[in-house]
Amino acid sequence: MEDPQAPTQARLVVALDGPGSSGKSSVGAAAALKVGYRFCDTGLLYRAVTWLALARKVSASYPHAVRGLVDEVELAPDEQGRLARVLIDGVDHTEDVRGPAVDEAVSAISAIPELRLALLDRQRALATPGGIVMAGRDIGTVVLPDADLKIFLDASVEERARRRTNERDLDPAGAEAAAILAALRKRDELDSTRAVAPLRAATDARIISTDGNRFEDTVDAVVNAIRDAEARRAAEPEPSGASA
């Protein structure tokens, strides 16, 4: 693991947003590892609540009941320090929350205003005291609007579907691949039109298009953006009255 630690005062809160399968989780985790930051994929919180709602047969039509599941969900660090393990009532359900049933239901659950509000303070607390890359769909616009650096990873829906198809080792001409493309299009529509915290790039975000990029190229672009922002922060004069 590379550990080129930046000075404490220059360690940033980085908001990394993007649509489904844009690479924000894998890219964000790799970039965070390179710069010695923590990493948090906030989408895991919504997936965990969705999995629990399915297991308990709690419908999205009952928002207060869904909101009541939040306290049972926890993110824990993995062996690399990333907040990437999902604990529900103390039991590891990391693999369960990535299943196809959750894929299908997570948009409807995530759109519940009461749930988004309930998770807001928790996500903000995770970002303290800095030195973190936080990935999601509304980090730079809602969760951390004052983040030191905002990045939005973008890619065409066809490119994102191709990646997910490859990840699952599916026939790109098969029915399952077509279903993935249709599901991503549906998720994009739901995420970008929901009433609360719709998917969009922050006005001050750096937009990185990943169409045709190698994974390593996108990671390097994010790392370079973080390093540039750290350098600018380190060069800022100390506030008047600060001790020498």
Where are each of the predicted segments found?
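Conserved glycine(s) of the Walker
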Residues: 23
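N-terminal phosphate/diphosphate-binding loop that engages ATP/GTP or pyrophosphate donors
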Residues: 33-101
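ATP-dependent NMP and nucleoside kinases share a basic, alpha-helical "lid"
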Residues: 94-171
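NTP-dependent small-molecule kinase module
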Residues: 2-5, 88-94, 162-171, 190, ...
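P-loop (Walker A) phosphate-binding loop of NTP-binding proteins
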Residues: 19
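Hydrophobic anchor at the beta1->P-loop junction of P-loop NTPases
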Residues: 16
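Hydrophobic positions on the alpha1 helix immediately C-terminal to the Walker A/P-loop
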Residues: 27
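Small-molecule kinase domains that catalyze NTP-dependent phosphoryl transfer to phosphate-bearing small molecules
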Residues: 78, 123-129, 139-142, 146, ...
